[in-house]
From Swiss-Prot:
Together with methyltransferase Trm7-34, methylates the 2'-O-ribose of nucleotides at position 34 of the anticodon loop of substrate tRNAs. Gene3D superfamilies: YVTN repeat-like/Quinoprotein amine dehydrogenase. Its main location: cytoplasm. Interacts with Trm7-34. SUPFAM superfamilies: WD40 repeat-like. Belongs to the WD repeat WDR6 family. It comes from the Eukaryota. WD repeats lie at residues 148-185, 200-239, 250-291, 294-333, 476-515, 527-566, 567-608, 664-704, 779-821, 826-865, 868-911. This is tRNA (34-2'-O)-methyltransferase regulator WDR6. Keywords: Cytoplasm, Repeat, tRNA processing, WD repeat. One of its GO terms (biological process) is negative regulation of cell population proliferation. SMART domains: WD40. PANTHER family: WD REPEAT PROTEIN, WD REPEAT-CONTAINING PROTEIN 6.
């Protein structure tokens, strides 16, 4: 089934890449991936250790929180065979494990050590021949027993084993199993002295790495620092000296992992943090590279393949990402090259464009046109050559499309065509077409152009002779010229001006001129769109992507029937502003003073320091969009950069498909099933402010769409089926609430090919209706439910706010921006959930003080008020059996309550409490009727808690049993679908079949 969970374990070896994914362990190699035979009972895989190879066999030790497993790996010419041979438990958390090569060890026995979080060391031996129990040879303890968060073991024999740990107080602790101070032969227990205690950090130490040859030790911590230490020892570890060198700060959150890299006799340090960034440092502490790798998810582990020189990382979403460092750490290739100057000290390139992969043209400060050829060999210096017979006048615009070069100035336009064979620039046109100073020249195609000037005069020109095709009337603004243009069809033209307005024009039937039909003000603020990209076009509408000076892509919908333009969707991206979208996967833009290339599949591909986005620059993609060339002007000099966008990673990763699940907690989940399909789609939302649409197919997930309408955490959502416009598509209205008192309403359509279309309908801020009219208090909206009226376009929306208000609104699709408050009730407690019972016309409300309310449709009548728990009710599920309402609830009091309410007289007919099932707050439960019968005698329940244990309860006999556990940390809820699948969500997602756990 599906598992998206933390990947805490990562081990790089010649045999492949081992990843601990939740309670599973996967081996990635050049062969198809192998899932190891692991049967952990409660934990997540935290680490691995390999033994040496003997007689084509080796042992793999795998450990979780307090469990460990031994797996025999038999190597053959065809493939490796893995067999689980032993499982064990410890009483304390396991921090590290290591196989040893002691001198008195026999070939049939393997010795290893397990280090636990209170500085205890288990020295054990396993007999390969008998598959018997592991024998404890020694229990070693340190005189210090503080709580340890990370341990690094060093040594090949037990008598010379060094233990370097970091504790919760930021101290670095070192001890060695060589000279015990206390010994108990009966219990094989020995105590060893602490050799070093060093105050290292102002927080928990999360990782330690050292290299004795380089005399370098590195630690990371909660304090966001990467600290370098000098480590020296002349003999055993009693002679060790560790002295601080310097601290490096490049992360904005906790630094969770670190590795030391050796590349071409140079030493580097790589660190990964909760901010999803990987920083690469030189041995002197210089930050060489900072790159976001995991789409915003916290990075838990780093691993380095010395042979392939690839840095791997794992994250909270379970993704494994590899980055080839061969070129990344090659200084000439990660920095821009300064091209030669023009020769005259008073003349410089002030604007430039790529003509092809090798030729760059530049417009000089003296309004002369130059060109240069970029050699593949960086050792060859480029030369700027002046274009002969170039008309002399002051230029304001330089644009290039294929081999056509356009230069413009006051009223005048000049076109040249570059001949790749002769290197000649043929003049195609030179003449006056405009009234003022030309500010914009847009290539709509190779022979159609849109030109605008500072007076608002705009023309659509065609052919290389610039014949006037039509006049276009622009807004009479201070800066009316065009920044982006798209000819959608022969009838429709989309323009964006310098002041931020986007305008839709339609060609007049009486003339060839275009008339303004619709507009959107300040689509990307007051700086205008930088580009339009046509995504789809049919007889009814067109979909267009727009990017500008903000961290969002906007998706526009053009409807031809009434010539209207609207924003259908937005998408948040990790760029300060967007400049171009040259391919489906690639977005180019700026962050602060860097040019950034961002990939939907690979996250940040490039961060090139250029000085900021205000300067003139251009780009070129080549080699199948895999190589990016960038040229820009800085301080009157031209800089050039060229490198591969996508790092070549070895074939061990070629078949790994990364998941696109939430990088923060998932708070709510709903299942929807399109018509004529059996597998459901998942609607999910969480702390990353994103609503995701994910298709479930067999045992895999495929993300289909995202909604970025929320500005804060999404707490709850509902999907209401809505009538579609015929065809095979299915449509839902999605209502969602969360932080900043925001209610968002969107439309989701899924066609027969499973393509999703999102349309953001409206967004509302629901202020406290009891406060003053000038109040700006924004209470978090905790829950929502929606009822569709008999009139299909009219809806009742029930919203529960963190201020204690339950509000009833009327909303109509025809007027989406209007929200009519009908009534509200203040229950004086924070509501945690609401649920509409359609068959009874009743709204069920659960609260933080353990009460459940039943309200009528208008919220004016309270049917009942029951005290079910002594603390908050975190989760609730119901089942209606004629006049009986079955309520199953779980709360902070760690108990589960089963209540049967008679709705005829509102009397409680049965109330059962299940104690002792869980030892943490209960956040997930569901009532299950396996035969789909209405008979309450066949009701069962499944429950889950923060302790991750899953229980099954027979609600008729009240017997229960533990049936499994989930890997999902901080479980927020669970659902059951028609295929008997359970969905657990929280910090990840896990699906499992009921039949597999019974």
């Amino acid at each position: 089934m599906v598992l998206i969970s933390d990947a805490f374990g990562l081990e790089i070896s010649p045999n492949g890449i081992l990843v601990g994914h939740g309670d599973q362990a996967v081996l990635y190699s050049s062969e198809p991936k192998v899932e190891l035979p692991v049967q952990l009972r409660e934990g997540k895989v935290r680490g691995f250790a390999w033994s040496s190879l003997r007689k084509s066999q080796r042992l793999l030790l795998l450990y979780s929180e307090n469990e460990y497993s031994l797996i025999r790996c038999t190597t053959s010419s065809e493939n490796d065979l893995f067999q689980l041979v032993y499982e064990g438990e410890t009483r304390d958390w396991i921090n590290a494990a290591l196989f040893l090569e002691d001198e008195n060890e026999s070939e049939d026995r393997k010795r290893f050590v397990l280090h636990t979080s209170h500085s205890a060391l288990l020295y054990m031996e396993y007999d390969l021949t008998s598959n018997a129990d592991c024998t404890v040879l020694e229990l070693a303890r340190c005189t210090d027993s503080s709580i340890l968060y990370y341990t690094k073991l060093h040594g090949s024999s037990f008598n010379k084993l060094a233990i370097i740990s970091g504790n919760a107080f930021g101290e670095l602790l070192v001890w060695q199993t060589q000279f015990p101070t206390e010994s108990d032969p009966k219990s094989v227990m020995k105590t060893y002295p602490l050799l070093l205690r060093i105050e290292a950090h102002n927080g928990v130490i999360h990782s330690i790495e050292f290299d004795l040859q380089s005399q370098l030790l590195v630690t990371t911590s909660d304090d966001r620092s990467v600290k370098f230490w000098n480590i020296q020892k002349s003999g055993d570890w009693t002679t060790a000296e560790i002295k601080p060198m310097f601290s490096c700060y490049g992360h904005s959150s906790r630094v969770m992992c670190v590795v030391i890299l050796k590349i071409d006799d140079r030493t580097f340090v790589a660190s990964g943090g909760e901010d999803s960034y990987v920083c690469i440092w030189s041995s002197s502490g210089e930050l060489i590279l900072k790159r976001r790798q995991q789409f915003g998810a916290p990075i838990w582990r780093l691993g380095f393949s010395q042979d392939a020189e690839i840095l791997y990382s794992t994250s909270s979403t379970g993704n494994l990402v590899g980055q080839n460092l061969k070129e990344v750490l090659n200084r000439p290739k990660i920095e821009s090259t300064i091209l030669s100057s023009l020769g005259d000290a008073n003349e410089f390139v002030r604007n430039l464009k790529f003509v092809n992969n090798e030729i760059i043209v530049g417009l000089s400060s003296l309004n002369r046109l130059y060109y240069t050829r970029i050699s593949p060999d960086s050792s060859h210096e480029n030369k700027w050559l002046m274009v002969n017979d170039f008309p002399s006048y002051k230029r304001t615009v330089l644009e290039v499309f294929d081999d056509i070069i356009a230069t413009c100035g006051h009223r005048r336009i000049t076109l040249h065509r570059y001949n790749t064979n002769t290197n000649d620039f043929e003049q195609l046109f030179d003449g006056i077409r405009m009234k003022g100073t030309i500010r914009s020249f847009q290539f709509l195609s190779r022979d159609r152009y849109l030109v605008s000037d500072n007076l608002g005069y705009c023309l659509l020109l065609q052919t290389h002779q610039l014949h006037i095709e039509s006049h276009i009337a622009l807004f009479n603004n201070r800066e009316p010229w065009i920044t982006a243009a798209l000819l959608i069809s022969e009838q429709y033209l989309l323009l964006g001006n310098r002041e931020g307005h986007v305008m839709l024009y339609c060609r007049s039937s009486a003339s060839d001129d275009f008339q303004l039909k619709d507009s959107i003000r300040y689509l990307h603020g007051k700086m205008g769109s930088n580009f339009f990209k046509l995504l789809s076009l049919n007889a009814d509408n067109a979909h267009v992507m727009s990017g500008g000076h903000e961290a969002f892509l906007k998706y526009l919908s053009v409807r031809f029937s009434d010539s209207t333009l609207r924003v259908s969707q937005r998408e948040g991206i990790p760029l300060a502003w967007v400049e171009a979208s040259p391919s489906d996967d690639l977005i180019l833009g700026f962050n602060d003073n860097h040019i950034v290339a961002w990939s939907r599949r690979n996250d940040i591909l490039l961060q090139l320091a250029c000085g900021g986005g205000h300067r003139c620059w251009d780009f070129r993609l080549s080699d199948g969009d895999s190589q990016l060339s960038i040229a820009y002007v800085k301080q009157k000099r031209v800089y050039f950069y060229r490198n591969s966008l996508y790092n070549a990673v070895d074939n061990r990763l070629k078949d790994i498909e990364p998941n696109n699940w939430h990088v923060r907690n998932c708070n709510t989940l709903r299942l929807i099933t399109p018509r004529n399909q059996s597998d459901p789609f998942i609607l999910s939302a969480g702390d990353d402010n994103i609503i995701k649409v994910t298709q479930v197919t067999n045992d895999s997930l495929s993300q289909r769409a995202e909604m970025h309408s929320h500005i804060s955490t999404v707490r709850s959502l509902q999907a209401i089926p809505y009538k579609s416009n015929g065809g095979d598509s299915s449509t839902w209205l999605v209502f969602s609430v969360g932080g900043r008192s925001q209610l968002c309403i969107s439309q989701l359509s899924i066609d027969a090919s499973n393509k999703c279309w999102i349309s953001e309908i409206s967004s509302h801020t629901l202020h406290n209706v009891a406060a003053s009219k000038t109040s700006t208090i924004e209470a978090r909206l905790m829950a929502i439910d929606v009822v569709q009226h008999s009139d299909g376009d009219l809806f009742s929306i029930y919203v529960a706010g963190g201020d204690g208000n339950i509000s009833h609104y009327i909303w109509e699709l025809e007027t989406p921006n209007q929200l009519d408050l009908k009534h509200f009730v203040d229950i004086q407690r924070c509501p945690l959930g609401i649920q509409w019972i359609a068959s009874k016309g009743m709204l069920l409300v659960s609260t933080t003080n353990g009460e459940v309310y039943g309200f009528d449709r208008t919220l004016e009548t309270t049917y009942f008020q029951l005290q079910l728990h002594v603390t908050g009710i975190n989760t609730i599920d119901i089942y209606v059996d004629r006049h009986l309402l079955h309520i199953l609830s779980g709360g902070d009091d760690e108990s589960i309550k089963y209540t049967v309410l008679n709705l005829n007289n509102n009397n409680v007919e049965q109330k059962i409490e299940y104690l002792g099932l869980h030892n943490a707050q209960v956040n997930a439960l569901a009532i299950h009727c396996p035969t789909k019968s209405v008979a309450a005698s066949e009701l069962f329940a499944y429950t889950c808690s923060i302790d991750r244990q899953i229980y099954r309860i027979d609600l008729s006999t009240h017997k229960y049993k533990r049936v499994g556990y989930t890997c999902i940390a901080d479980v927020k809820g669970m659902l059951l679908d028609e295929h008997q699948r359970m969905y657990f969500y929280g910090c990840g997602l896990q699906t499992m079949s009921i039949s597999n756990i019974l």
